[in-house]
């Protein structure tokens, strides 16, 4: 069975990379595609079968030592959702569904939305998220029933028989019509989820300062744009994360890099930062590999091939090294490890290139994930900036008895640097060994030894390269 073999191979691929979280896309499904799909599965019998299948999938994934976090979109729904039913999917179903709020004023879901006019039947005067009529915004403040329902959803999926391991919350700061209610809701949501499953993680999507939500009573952590994706992208590529802008003054600028990282890390707090979702790419932004070609634009104007041209794998490997050695939870967007390119949504949601993967990048990701797994200090150790110059950064991860040093040269020239690694607790004449190096043309995991002099590491760096060294283990 080809479908069984496909699923088996996919699970094996994900398992091989399971130390880094893998973000799986929902694909490029616009409203028309979603509507077509719902027409096939809207029967209650099919929905029950789908839930049972999902519970089994989670069980199988857990048996393989992996975890599952599901996406909760609680700020808005689709216009095709049964609560709104603008496309008349449920009203035309053979099953007995209540009418949607779009269709009739008397709909039991009327209070779930904010309407501005009285034009029933088929009232299109509802509030859409950011004005999108395909994404009706939910109106919690005027519907206790809606709030209770979503809190029940929060409990349901982290409980038996589904037992998922947490929630990723879509545009979480936008929920509700006031900041006060937003905080009130997420406090209730946290209590509901943690009572059902104390180990379930609550991970929010938010752009900007998340300090107020990360005080221990709402979100556990966030998708880390401000203290990871953006500073890494600016430093290594000079590009904005949608590929909408190129800023030469940010490219190779260590002051901006460390300044942005440290300021935003401090705003998050240690516990939240230690488990933050550190991504290079995702379903809302251009692929990191595409950002390395410095092409500004989107697929509608440039076409998909422009995203593939003149990409720089050496810069991409630098980024992956940072991702796997920086504090936080490294999260791979499916296909990045195989060399998938793409401009921002929808081009970033290309299918996985089965049989056409970049084999070198696959091997590299396996090795760099193995490095992350085998060096506990990279997961739980302290962090310190050690060195900076134009195009060059160095930092350390360390504990009472271990240390790892990371050095990146994003420039077009070879350089020699002298780094005060004694600040990580290494002895003044300690021995360290290189455990990974990336460069133009590939990477190596061959070992190479260095001896510190007066607590400093003197090392030559190839152009567009990254080096990872650790305390020599006798």
Stretches found by the model and what they are:
Residues 1-14:
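Single conserved hydrophobic/aromatic residue that forms the stacking wall/gate
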């Amino acid at each position: 069975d080809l479908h069984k073999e496909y699923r088996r191979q996919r699970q094996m691929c994900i398992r091989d990379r399971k130390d880094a979280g893998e973000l799986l896309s929902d694909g490029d499904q616009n409203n028309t595609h979603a509507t077509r799909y719902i027409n096939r599965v809207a029967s209650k019998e099919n929905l029950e079968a789908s839930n049972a299948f999902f519970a089994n999938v989670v069980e199988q994934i857990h048996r393989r030592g992996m975890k599952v976090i599901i996406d909760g979109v609680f700020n808005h729904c689709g216009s095709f959702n049964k609560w709104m039913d603008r496309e008349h999917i449920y009203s035309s179903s053979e099953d007995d569904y209540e009418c949607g709020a779009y269709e009739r004023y008397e709909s039991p879901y009327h209070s779930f939305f904010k309407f501005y006019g009285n034009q029933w039947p088929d009232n299109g005067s509802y509030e859409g998220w950011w004005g999108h009529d395909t994404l009706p915004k939910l109106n919690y403040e005027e519907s206790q029933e809606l709030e209770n329902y979503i809190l029940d959803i929060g409990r349901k999926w982290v409980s038996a028989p589904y037992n998922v391991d947490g929630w990723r919350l879509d545009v979480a700061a936008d929920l509700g019509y006031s900041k006060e209610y937003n905080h009130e809701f997420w406090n209730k949501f946290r209590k509901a989820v943690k009572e059902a499953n104390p180990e379930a993680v609550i991970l929010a999507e938010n752009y900007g300062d998340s300090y107020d939500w990360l005080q221990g009573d709402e979100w556990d952590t966030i998708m880390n744009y401000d203290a990871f994706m953006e500073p890494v992208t600016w430093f290594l590529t000079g590009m904005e994360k949608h590929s909408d802008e190129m800023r030469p003054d940010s490219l190779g600028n260590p002051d901006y890099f460390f300044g942005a990282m440290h300021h935003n890390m401090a705003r998050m707090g240690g516990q939240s930062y230690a488990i933050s979702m550190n991504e290079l790419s995702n379903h809302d932004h251009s692929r990191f590999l595409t950002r390395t070609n410095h092409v500004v634009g989107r697929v509608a104007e440039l076409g998909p091939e422009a995203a593939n041209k003149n990409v720089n794998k050496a810069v991409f490997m630098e980024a992956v090294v940072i991702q796997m050695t920086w504090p936080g939870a490294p999260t791979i967007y499916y296909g990045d490890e195989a060399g998938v390119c793409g401009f921002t949504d929808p081009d970033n949601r290309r299918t996985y290139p089965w049989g056409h993967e970049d084999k070198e990048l696959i091997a590299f990701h396996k090795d760099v994930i193995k490095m992350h797994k085998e060096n506990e200090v990279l997961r739980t150790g302290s962090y310190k900036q050690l060195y900076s110059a134009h195009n060059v950064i160095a930092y350390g991860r360390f504990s009472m008895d271990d240390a790892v040093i990371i050095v990146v040269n994003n420039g077009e020239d070879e350089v020699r640097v002298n780094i005060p690694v004694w600040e990580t607790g290494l002895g003044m004449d300690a021995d360290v060994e290189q455990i990974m190096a990336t460069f133009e043309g590939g990477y190596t995991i061959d070992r190479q030894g260095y001896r510190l002099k007066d607590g400093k590491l003197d090392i030559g760096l190839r152009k567009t390269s990254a080096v990872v060294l650790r305390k020599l283990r006798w």
